[in-house]
């Protein structure tokens, strides 16, 4: 990219663009120093077929940030999971935001915020009443500014 900032458009990703989604997922974990090269390669190998199925059945939606030259500068997605209703939320689906990533040369331009606002509007339009995500240290400030709060979630790894 030259020094000029291009106009960014956020658009829904096509299933044929799964390679860029997987590239962003791998880059996200690499940037957080999560996983060895071999583990990241295996993750992409396993995630590819899952992503194709999830995009085909509508359980995963992804958006890309593209500039005027159609360079992809980032993206983010949402996974819709079956979930039992509870007293405060009668919905039987839960939305989980995943894979929010901005390429290094596109950072500090508000692109992650644009992606998140697009995803949040889409989730609201589906009639869902909330959304979860796991925040990296880099993303936590943005998510807090958007109104996300820490919860009482716990995890056990095997």
Spell out what each predicted region is.
Residues 82-86, 92, 132-138, 144, ...:
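Conserved catalytic-core motifs of GNAT/GCN5-like acyltransferases
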Residues 9-23, 34:
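A short beta-loop-alpha structural element at the N-terminal edge
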Residues 123-135:
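Conserved GNAT acetyl-CoA-binding A-motif
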Residues 64, 71-80, 96, 101:
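Conserved beta-strand in the GNAT
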Residues 49-64, 96:
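A short helix-loop-beta-strand connector motif used in the catalytic cores of GNAT acetyltransferases and
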Residues 29-50:
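Conserved GNAT-fold acetyl-CoA-binding loop/helix
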Residues 106, 110-118:
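Conserved acetyl-CoA pyrophosphate-binding loop and the N-cap/start of the following alpha-helix
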């Amino acid at each position: 990219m030259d020094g000029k900032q291009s106009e960014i458009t956020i658009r829904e990703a096509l299933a044929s663009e799964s390679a860029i989604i997987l590239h962003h997922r791998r880059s996200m974990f690499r940037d957080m120093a999560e996983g060895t090269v071999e583990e990241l390669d295996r993750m992409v190998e396993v995630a590819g077929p899952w992503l194709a199925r999830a995009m085909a059945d509508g359980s995963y939606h992804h958006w890309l940030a593209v500039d005027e030259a159609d360079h992809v500068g980032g993206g983010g997605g949402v996974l819709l999971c079956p979930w039992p209703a509870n007293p405060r939320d009668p919905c039987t689906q839960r939305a989980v935001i995943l894979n929010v990533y901005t390429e290094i040369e596109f950072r500090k331009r508000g692109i992650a915020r644009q992606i998140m606002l697009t995803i949040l509007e889409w989730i609201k339009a589906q009639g869902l009443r909330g959304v979860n995500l796991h925040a990296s240290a880099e993303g936590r400030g943005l998510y807090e500014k958007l109104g996300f709060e820490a919860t009482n979630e716990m995890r056990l790894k095997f």
